[in-house]
Amino acid sequence: MRYVKLPKENTYEFLERLKDWGKLYAPVKISDKFYDFREIDDVRKIEFHYNRTIMPPKKFFFKPREKLFEFDISKPEYREVIEEVEPFIIFGVHACDIYGLKILDTVYLDEFPDKYYKVRREKGIIIGISCMPDEYCFCNLRETDFADDGFDLFFHELPDGWLVRVGTPTGHRLVDKNIKLFEEVTDKDICAFRDFEKRRQQAFKYHEDWGNLRYLLELEMEHPMWDEEADKCLACGICNTTCPTCRCYEVQDIVNLDGVTGYRERRWDSCQFRSHGLVAGGHNFRPTKKDRFRNRYLCKNAYNEKLGLSYCVGCGRCTAFCPANISFVGNLRRILGLEENKCPPTVSEEIPKRGFAYSSNIRGDGV
């Protein structure tokens, strides 16, 4: 990998030059507590030391709402509507959000590529930035706190500038086109980088092993936590909309006022909505709020056997923005036995039966 240094005094000039490559988006402060990725007119408004944006960068690639095709019911045909996307740059993406995009890639690009997602992914330039964790961050436990790839450039803060890692041919071109703004990395810079990474690791609130989380979630399907926390849940879906990896959508046909023409659109859906598991005939795969609440925890941490990865990147958004003050990481730690001295007796006695039946998909009195 190639490493260069961008001196602090050249930062804004480099950011300004990025606009020559397309629209520039970066984190800006939108209120006392909140940040969001917005199009940048004035590069001096960019926030380099933000904790997290409300919406993850997935919104640029997987649109909250988009038209798929148009139709005319008088004709046996339809016309696909694929947006013409101009190149764009997203600056200031944290490592956990980069991992989030990589997970979305496994869903929308592997096997059967989604053309709507793909066209945006091909046009987007990703520039990551280092960060210090706050009390909500647990990306270190998900091993998503340091990005090895998935970016064109990655900026690591130094006392007098940035150590820049170059991750793609596009990243090389960005540096080479502006080579006069960059310098070689010195021994002093390497020491500063090492010191920053050491302090960053020490700043995390939690330092523990979550390696058996998936299995404990499968075993603890009736843990009392599910009832307690589901009762608090407002089923608003904000944990889904702010999540970097939530990818469910619903599809609807919209007929225009002429009653003949229309279009099909897809829009983000939430597994916390009752309608999410509702199918023809009125059957609902997850009829209760508890079912839906528990399903999200399983989706993020247990439904990953095929890909061998967690669908949670530890960004902390679902906890930080939850209006009911439900702690996602706190609930997982309860399942892991890290926030309670011992399991309730009724739970520990039934674990062997429930665990075997659940994991093996076997049901019956003899299990």
From Swiss-Prot:
The keyword Cytoplasm applies. [4Fe-4S] cluster 2 binds at C312, C315, C318, C322. It is found in: Cytoplasm. One of its GO terms (molecular function) is 4 iron, 4 sulfur cluster binding. Optimum pH is 8.4 for sulfur reductase activity at 80 degrees Celsius. One of its GO terms (cellular component) is cytoplasm. PROSITE patterns: 4FE4S_FER_1, 4FE4S_FER_2. Stimulated by rubredoxin at pH 7.6 but not ferredoxin. Its cofactor is [4Fe-4S] cluster. InterPro entries: 4Fe4S_Fe-S-bd, 4Fe4S_Fe_S_CS, Helical_ferredxn, NADPH_Sulfhydrogenase_Subunit. Optimum temperature is 80 degrees Celsius for maximal sulfur reductase activity. Activity increases linearly from above 30 degrees Celsius to reach maximal levels at 80 degrees Celsius and then decreases to 15% of activity at 90 degrees Celsius. It comes from the Archaea. [4Fe-4S] cluster 1 binds at C233, C236, C239, C243. Binds 2 [4Fe-4S] clusters. It catalyses: n sulfur + H2 = (n-1) sulfur + hydrogen sulfide + H(+). It is an enzyme of class 1 (oxidoreductase). Residues 222-254, 303-332 form the 4Fe-4S ferredoxin-type domain. Disulfide bonds: none annotated. Keywords: 4Fe-4S, Cytoplasm, Iron, Iron-sulfur, Metal-binding, Oxidoreductase, Repeat. It holds the Pfam family Fer4_22. PANTHER family: ANAEROBIC SULFITE REDUCTASE SUBUNIT A. Heterotetramer of alpha, beta, gamma and delta subunits. The nickel-containing alpha and delta subunits constitute the hydrogenase activity. The beta and gamma subunits (flavin-containing dimer) constitute the sulfur reductase activity. Part of a bifunctional enzyme complex that functions as an NADPH-dependent hydrogen-evolving hydrogenase with sulfur reducing activity. May play a role in hydrogen cycling during fermentative growth. Activity not exhibited with NAD. The beta and gamma subunits form the sulfur reducing component that catalyzes the cytoplasmic production of hydrogen sulfide in the presence of elemental sulfur. Not active in the presence of sodium sulfate, sodium sulfite, sodium thiosulfate or cysteine. NCBIfam families: sulfhyd_HydB. This is Sulfhydrogenase 1 subunit beta. It comes from Pyrococcus furiosus (strain ATCC 43587 / DSM 3638 / JCM 8422 / Vc1). The lineage of its organism: Archaea, Methanobacteriati, Methanobacteriota, Thermococci, Thermococcales.
